[in-house]
Structures are given as C-alpha cells and as structure tokens.
Swiss-Prot record:
There is a cross-link at residues 147, 187, 189, 285 (Glycyl lysine isopeptide (Lys-Gly) (interchain with G-Cter in SUMO2)). Pfam families: HLH. Gene3D superfamilies: Helix-loop-helix DNA-binding domain. Residues 283-294 have a biased composition (Basic and acidic residues). It comes from the Eukaryota. Residues 100-120 are annotated as: Leucine-zipper 1. Residues 118-141, 283-338 are annotated as: Disordered. InterPro entries: bHLH_dom (IPR011598), HLH_DNA-bd_sf (IPR036638), Max-like/E-box_TFs (IPR052207). This is Transcription factor AP-4. Its main location: nucleus. The modification Phosphoserine is found at residues 123-124, 139. The keyword Zinc does not apply.
Length: 338
C-alpha cells in the first residue's frame, strides 16, 4: 500500500487559489448584477480595503523616497554615487553636526571681533573732537553737515511716500466711487435730486433778492428830486399846486433819513397830503388853479415867474390867513413840514 505525502508548501498555494477563485466569482457576480452570498460580499469588501491600503502605502513610500532624494541633493557627495537610505541618513546627521560646529565657531569669532572693535574705538571719538578743536576755530563741523544731509534725505523720502500715498488714496477713492455708482445707483439719483433742489432754491432766493433790490431802487428813484429846470419852457414852470408837485417838493426838502426809512416816508406823505388838502380848500379852487396853470404854460418863458404871483394873489383873497401863509412859504422853497 502506497502513501503519498503532500508537502506543506502546497497548502498555502491551494488556499490562495481558493481566495482568488472567490474574488473572481464575486467580481463576476457584481458585473452580472447577481445577488452575492454573504461570504462573497465579505471577500469583496476585504479586497476593496486591501486595494485602498495598498494605494496609501504606495503614496507613503513615494513621499519617503522623494524626501530621501532631497536630502541626497543637500549633503555633499560625488556625482553618480549610489547611496542607500541608511547611508543618506547617516551622512545628513554628520553634515548637520559639522554645520552646528561651524556656526559656534563663527559666533565666537564675531564676538571677539566686536570686543576688539570696542577696545579700539573706545576713546577715539573724544580724541578726534579734541584734535578738531585744536586745529582751528574756522574748521567745518562735519557732524552737522552729515546731520543736515540725513535730514534732507529723510525729507525727500517722506515726500515721496506722501506722493505715493496720495496717488493710492485717489485711486482708491475713484474705485470706491465707481463701486458705489454700480451698487447704489438709486442713492446717486437721490443725491443728484437734492443738489438740483438746492440749486433751484438758491436761484429762487437770488431772484427774490433781485426783485427786492429793484423795488428799493424804484422807491428811491421816486423819492429823489427831479432835475432842475433850465431851458425847456414846460419844465421852467414853478411847482404847480396839484398834489404830485407838492409831494415831490416837500420830500426833496426833507432830511436824508426820511428817504432811507419807509415808515418815516409814509408819515411824511400823510402830512403832505393833509397840508395839500388844507391849501387847496375846495374843488372849485382846484379847477381855477388848473386853468391858471394852463394859461401859464401857454405863455412865454419870461412871463412864467409872474404867473405864480398872480395866482397866489387871487388865492390869498379867497383863502384864509393861515392858508395864505402856507401858500407863500411853498413857492419860496421853505416847504418843510412837521
């Protein structure tokens, strides 16, 4: 009877074959949309997890290899020399140690040089100043010149900085305005309307002021005396008795304050009207005076001054003693009223 011994190395190969067979079956079932058994589903999940782990491990190894390559470029080595990862790490550690030693040595040298410079330049500035003073009074002060130059340079730099800041600020303001114009067009419209309203109000106010000034000028021109009659026969006629003539004569003889203030001018007008009514007396008397005035205008220029005397004489006979006094005062020019 013969016995066949199965070697132990073939057992894992059979297990591996069975696993691969199950994976293939699971993949075919997933492709054919066939419901999987629980065992095949577990195998498929394991396969997916294994693939994910393999990809992560691959990435990790790639990053490690890249780090070793960068270290290899940093450390001193000959071109074409092949170095393992352990050799690269060892050489980098040695290189870092040597760099630290070099750093400490340079720091010690730097401190020694600083001390040497301080020892040499400890009393030198005082000696130099004393020597400069001993040389002569008219020697130029170098320190002041250097300070002045430094100040000038600082001023120039500050001006340049200010110009740059101004240009930047103007650019930013323009950008802000453009953004506001894009984002808030309604706000700009409201502002424009407000500006237009303000301009309209200002125009109305100016027109009102101009109107008031024109009215004041008209009042002043009305209150001013007429030009002195010289050559025209119709203008040479003395102040006629009707109300307008008396009004003009009395106001011109009044003070300057009467022309300036409106209230005083009104009071003067009232008093003038009362005086004129008192002088005229009755309506019949006015008609007679108008006829006499027409007769005076028709006469030549030489007979004009005689007309008021005859008129006043006829008026004095018909009027009272008080009215006659007032009529004499007015042609003579003394027409001031209380």
């Amino acid at each position: 009877m013969e016995y066949f011994m199965v070697p132990t190395q073939k057992v894992p190969s059979l297990q591996h074959f069975r696993k691969t067979e199950k994976e293939v079956i699971g993949g075919l079932c997933s492709l054919a949309n066939i419901p999987l058994t629980p065992e095949t589903q577990r195998d498929q999940e394991r396969r997916i997890r294994r693939e994910i782990a393999n990809s992560n491990e691959r990435r990790r190894m790639q990053s490690i290899n890249a780090g070793f390559q960068s270290l290899k470029t940093l450390i001193p080595h000959t071109d074409g020399e092949k170095l393992s990862k352990a050799a690269i790490l060892q050489q980098t550690a040695e290189y870092i140690f040597s760099l630290e030693q070099e750093k400490t040595r340079l720091l010690q040298q730097n401190t020694q040089l600083k001390r040497f410079i301080q020892e040499l330049s400890g009393s030198s500035p005082k000696r130099r100043r004393a020597e400069d003073k001993d040389e002569g009074i008219g020697s130029p002060d170098i320190w002041e010149d250097e300070k002045a130059e430094d100040l000038r340079r600082e001023m120039i730099e500050l001006r340049q900085q200010l110009d740059k800041e101004r240009s930047v600020r103007m650019m930013l303001e323009e950008q802000v305005r453009s953004l506001e114009a894009h984002m808030y067009p309604e706000k700009l419209k409201v502002i424009a309307q407000q500006v237009q309203l303000q301009q309209q109000q200002e125009q109305v106010r100016l027109l009102h002021q101009e109107k008031l000034e024109r009215e004041q000028q008209q009042l002043r021109t009305q209150l001013l005396p007429p030009p002195a009659p010289t050559h025209h026969p119709t203008v040479i006629v003395p102040a006629p008795p009707p109300p307008p003539s008396h009004h003009i004569n009395v106001v011109t003889m009044g003070p300057s304050s009467v022309i300036n203030s409106v209230s005083t001018s009104r009071q003067n007008l009232d008093t003038i009207v009362q005086a004129i009514q008192h002088i005229e007396g009755t309506q019949e008397k006015q008609e007679l005076e108008e006829e006499q005035r027409r007769a005076v205008i028709v006469k030549p220029v030489r007979s004009c001054p005689e007309a008021p005397t005859s008129d006043t004489a006829s008026d004095s006979e018909a009027s009272d003693s008080d009215a006659m006094d007032q009529s004499r005062e007015e042609p003579s020019g003394d027409g001031e009223l209380p």
